[in-house]
Amino acid sequence: MPLFGSTFSPKKTPPRKSASLSNLHNLDRSTREVELGLDYGTPTMNLAGQSLKFENGQWIAETGISGGVDRREAQRLRRRNQQLEEENNLLRLKVDILLDMLSETTAESHLMEKELDELKSVSRRRK
């Protein structure tokens, strides 16, 4: 028997209400399309003056030429973009190396200045 009253007994939760009173889920796809007009067709969008449609998991330009840029031009631009990214990565690496060299040289110069100051103070004491 518990010291301060009865044992823990949570309140019973009320039963859930039915999720949907609609019978739309009972209809097959073709009936829903006819009755409700749910035939949307392929998704399309207009981006920067270029009309695209979604087919087989990919966005495809509706015209043969995608907004004035043909496939060869797009491929050339991709290659140029790749070259520029590689060049950018190389330049970042060079900057990192130069910064490392600068910090190393700065540390060495501070050490030399410190040694020089110590030698000057020792030579002053001897005089």
Curated annotation (Swiss-Prot):
Biological process terms in GO annotation: cardiac muscle cell differentiation; cell projection organization; fat cell differentiation; negative regulation of Wnt signaling pathway
Sequence positions bearing Phosphoserine: 9, 20
Start and end residues of each stretch annotated as Minimal region for the interaction with PKD2: 60-112
Keywords noted in UniProt: Cell projection, Cilium, Cilium biogenesis/degradation, Coiled coil, Cytoplasm, Cytoskeleton, Differentiation, Flagellum, Golgi apparatus, Nucleus, Phosphoprotein
Region listing for Disordered, in residue ranges: 1-26
Cellular location(s): Nucleus speckle; Cytoplasm, Cytoskeleton, Cilium basal body; Cytoplasm, Cytoskeleton, Microtubule organizing center, Centrosome, Centriole; Golgi apparatus
GO cellular component: centriole; Golgi apparatus; nuclear speck; nucleus; sperm flagellum
Principal cellular location given in the protein's record: nucleus
Coiled-coil region list: 68-125
Leucine-zipper: annotated segments: 77-98
CDD domains in alphabetical order: Cby_like
Biased composition (Polar residues): 1-10
Pfam families from the UniProt entry: Chibby
InterPro entries: Chibby_fam
Note: 'Chibby' is Japanese for 'small'; the gene was so named for the RNAi phenotype seen in flies.
Assembly mode: Homodimer. Homodimerization is essential for nuclear localization and interaction with KPNA4 but is dispensable for interaction with CTNNB1. Interacts with polycystin-2/PKD2 and GM130. Interacts with the C-terminal region of CTNNB1. Interacts (C-terminus) with TCIM (C-terminus), TCIM competes with CTNNB1 for the interaction with CBY1. Interacts with FAM92A; this interaction facilitates targeting of FAM92A to cilium basal body. Interacts with CIBAR2. Interacts with KPNA4.
Task of the protein: Inhibits the Wnt/Wingless pathway by binding to CTNNB1/beta-catenin and inhibiting beta-catenin-mediated transcriptional activation through competition with TCF/LEF transcription factors. Has also been shown to play a role in regulating the intracellular trafficking of polycystin-2/PKD2 and possibly of other intracellular proteins. Promotes adipocyte and cardiomyocyte differentiation.
Family: Belongs to the chibby family.
Protein name: Protein chibby homolog 1
Annotated source species: Bos taurus
Lineage, highest ranks first: Eukaryota, Metazoa, Chordata, Craniata, Vertebrata
